[in-house]
């Protein structure tokens, strides 16, 4: 199976992290390690344990992709998850008796599950790193990473450098952006999240997200916090922005579908499905549906940009 070739700058989300001072635990939701380790090591260990735990759960839904004995399992990115659930719902309506189980867990966990054969398809919102490139990848959509604030926040635009400095912890107060004084409540995703890894590549470059940021384990959790906190700032899949939060422009460009399609909006990444081998049988039929005009229209209707 082949999809329309798409050119995108490749990157590796793996990098070293600066050491953090010992601190009381737990500091924030999403911090998984109760030891005085560096921030990167602490969260990497947490991501590893999470991936191993999820892998055991994924085995329960995994069939062989060809027989009718088990549900097909799609597992991984929480950014891809709601869109995969919509596709699965429509596909099962059109194919009575077919069963598709969609699970989250994060891009890295989904990729690992696909590598180990614990999921028929892994879902990723980041590019594959070198050690993962033996997997067969299928681009299914383009998505933007939207920077979001509370609807009451008058902020409408951030420069890319300003955004970087906020997440570095160099800009910490709304006063520094010309707004009434109050500390900025910075919200980020956990390590292992494809959204975070894409954000680190596209925004942070060789710098690091401040240990002072509140860590959340899904796009939905970030959105809920920002929706309830007038002083917060976070980032989520552009396809998941709703009227509870406000997306701000980056360098004067909003994350609209047209701007994502043209890539005038710079925070853009692909959504991928991955497997150990090219899909066959029931799995191939599902992928064909996702890449069909109907499947792509469904993704477009949900706020993504189709690849075909």
Task: Pin down the residues of each PLM region.
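Low-acidity, Ser/Thr- and Arg-rich intrinsically disordered low-complexity segments
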Residues: 2, 7-10
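Short, low-complexity, charge-dense intrinsically disordered segments
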Residues: 6, 20-29, 307
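Intrinsic-disorder-associated, low-complexity terminal segments enriched in Asp/Asn/His/Tyr and depleted
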Residues: 11, 16-17
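Bacterial N-terminal signal peptides
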Residues: 44-57
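Exported/periplasmic ABC-transporter solute-binding proteins
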Residues: 61-108, 112-308
